[in-house]
Amino acid sequence: MPKKKTGARKKAENRREREKQLRASRSTVDLAKHPCNASMECDKCQRRQKNRAFCYFCNSVQKLPICAQCGKTKCMMKSSDCVIKHAGVYSTGLAMVGAICDFCEAWVCHGRKCLSTHACACPLTDAECVECERGVWDHGGRIFSCSFCHNFLCEDDQFEHQASCQVLEAETFKCVSCNRLGQHSCLRCKACFCDEHTRSKVFKQEKGKQPPCPKCGHETQETKDLSMSTRSLKFGRQTGGEEDGASGYDAYWKNLSSDKYGDTGYHDDDEEEDEAEDEEEEDGKDSDAESSDLFNNLNLGRTYASGYAHYEEQES
């Protein structure tokens, strides 16, 4: 018969379970809720932007900096592992900070744990917008992640990108390697794969997760759970409207059918335009002939253009 658990043992097991859950949840923190990507309002210019060490617009320093790792604005002496020891009960402002992250451009407090772990675990390490290719240092807004392909997006492109993200680079939902229906879709490659071709020797499937994409290794999703649409290609007369109003094959057949029933108005207009163009060309030819007759009797004497230049050179 097992021994009965004591109160201290129960507390220790519960503490270990909570710590395990916290460690697992840190890797799945929403990018919009991370302290280094928090929303900040400048004290001087009152413009809202991403959490930064210096204002992106006026370069001023904030009165209460926010730590990019733990998110605190006040360092308590009793409950922290401060690298810089401060004599008071707590410290705020520039007395609390210890470094600036090169990736997220935000302050990191002078706690030993934050200084040693933030640079390696910063979620904005390679944060470059997939649409405009701007990084954290190139614009003042916050960084977001696409909910479909999980690529980085800036504030300007996040809505437009996510509205057009679920579009396949194909005209059908068939697997790119065979002719069967693609049951799994990769939203980064914009391609579908069947069950057989999702098995890859390069990328291994983790337990409890969807199979990875055989091309890029990103986790695929079931096509039936997505609002996927295919790319539509238009050729020839299907491309759109034209200047004369005849767009597409429908308008072409409508014009033919109207000619059969005696509707010749369209052709009458063309004939009138052709006659007007012919009259303009004839008037232009007549005016050119009259101008040439005026200069035929004009005599300018011996000139270089008339061919007498070499005679004048010999005489001199």
From Swiss-Prot:
Main localization of the protein described in the UniProt heading: nucleus
Origin: domain of life: Eukaryota
Chain residue ranges for the region called Disordered: 1-24, 227-299
Acidic residues bias: start-end ranges: 268-291
Residue numbers of Phosphoserine PTMs: 287
Motif (Nuclear localization signal): 3-11
Family matches, as PANTHER family: ZINC FINGER PROTEIN 330
Family: Belongs to the NOA36 family.
The name this protein goes by in its record: Zinc finger protein 330
Organism from which the protein derives: Mus musculus
Biological classification of the source: Eukaryota, Metazoa, Chordata, Craniata, Vertebrata
Gene giving rise to this polypeptide: Znf330
